[in-house]
Amino acid sequence: FNKIEIPDFENTPKLSGKLSSVKASAKASFIGPLSQIKPIQTPLKKQLLVILSGPEPQRSRFAKDIIEEAVQLGFPIIVTGESKPLPHSKLVKALGYCNSSELEQLMNESSHIVCRSGYSTLMELAAIGKKALLVPTSGQFEQEYLAKYWGEQFNFPTSNDHEISTKDFVKYLNDTSDFERRE
């Protein structure tokens, strides 16, 4: 390679922790996070945005578990990223896949977000300065590491996709601490 571009900050705290650590090299340069999602001025809605991603069958199990737990709290839920029909109710609105401008609007207007801890999603959260309940896909070691790192470094709430519970949601929904926008 003639050039290595690293989508992270050179200085700490890095978004990717040890994953972007490199030995000094003239070829490597830190270019900051990459995100299609930008902060926009929009009224904040009290709703839980669930962004589904990852392989099946984990994706469908994740959707089912989150909806079952969150509905118990009486919180409006919007689900994106699911191709299969989801149970609709007064509180659940399933949108399927969203384009980037739709997702940008939803992420900016939602008071709460639940998502996987993939690096692209984390860069989007950093770009808009939003906290989320991070639930790594089991067996995806990068996601597991990043969820743990963001929990420790940026005080993000995390949960395990096999053990997500109403208690996790209540703790997250009551978390009023801020996350500084980083771009």
Which stretches of residues belong to each language-model region?
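Active-site-proximal region of nucleotide-activated glycan assembly enzymes
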Residues: 1-30
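Hydrophobic/aromatic beta-strand patches that form the interior of the parallel beta-sheet core
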Residues: 3-5, 29-31, 78, 93-95, ...
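Short glycine-/small-residue-rich Rossmann-like dinucleotide-binding loops
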Residues: 9, 53, 118
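Residues in the short beta-alpha loop(s) of Rossmann-like NAD(P)-binding domains
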Residues: 10, 81-83, 138
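Donor-nucleotide binding loops and adjacent catalytic segments primarily
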Residues: 32-112, 162
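A donor-sugar binding/catalytic signature common to diverse glycosyltransferases
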Residues: 102-145
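Acidic, glycine-centered active-site loop in nucleotide-sugar glycosyltransferases
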Residues: 129, 146-156
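Leloir-type glycosyltransferase catalytic cores
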Residues: 155-183
